[in-house]
Design a protein with these regions (language model features):
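Short linear sequence motif anchored by a di-proline
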Residues: 8, 23-25
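Short secondary-structure capping/junction motifs at helix and strand boundaries
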Residues: 5, 80-84, 182-183
Length: 192
């Protein structure tokens, strides 16, 4: 009986924090990314050879074109007629969203418009992980699976499929970074 008020209070506090954050995001405008440059980069076999994890990042911001290319490679639309993506997804649920934590704000990548939609007007990079280097990286990608989009899957399959789908997107990001000489690391050590 005593736990209910605490849970309710916690939920109310969380709701207030998020509402305040969304109000702040209203001041930000969506960012229309330039079209991806699909004719650049190293051949696949060379990118595979160069693929590696790095935990050392230049804090210099990525140019807008580089960010556009990176997000499109990760999970952009590569078949406009069907809306299908560069990364496969189980049953084509496309349940994984990519949040982009930049110094000025947190954005949601919208593959349909190839744009960044503002979510929170705050630098949340440091909050995305426990490692010291996360605050220095020019950006952090956060992959979030929305299981509500996986209506016909069982609970066990939702976990399995979304884990695989995030892996496909992350591998695309790794290969793009290898082809462009960018540092990248997938992290699992995060506050849950």
């Amino acid at each position: 009986m005593n736990k209910s008020p605490k849970v309710l209070l916690f939920a109310l506090v969380v709701r207030c924090i998020f509402c305040a954050a969304f109000v702040c995001a209203d001041d930000l405008k969506p960012i229309q990314l330039p079209p991806p440059q699909t004719e650049i980069g190293k051949p696949l076999m060379q990118a595979l050879k160069l693929r590696q994890t790095s935990r050392s990042f230049d804090s210099k911001p990525l140019p807008r074109q580089e960010l556009s290319n990176l997000l499109w490679a990760g999970d952009g639309i590569n078949r406009a007629d069907s809306g299908k993506r560069t990364a496969p997804s189980a049953m084509n649920c496309q349940e994984v969203d990519i949040y982009v934590a930049l110094p000025e704000a947190l954005y949601l990548y919208d593959p349909k418009t190839h744009s960044l939609v503002p979510v929170v007007a705050k630098d949340l990079r440091e909050a995305t992980g426990k490692q010291d280097f996360v605050k220095d990286a020019p950006l952090t990608l956060v992959y979030v699976a929305d299981w509500a989009r996986m209506k016909s899957a069982t609970e066990a399959d939702k976990q399995l499929y979304s884990g695989a789908d995030v892996g496909f997107i992350a591998q695309n990001v790794y290969l793009y970074c290898a082809s462009q000489g960018l540092a990248v690391v997938v992290r699992g050590s995060v506050d849950r």
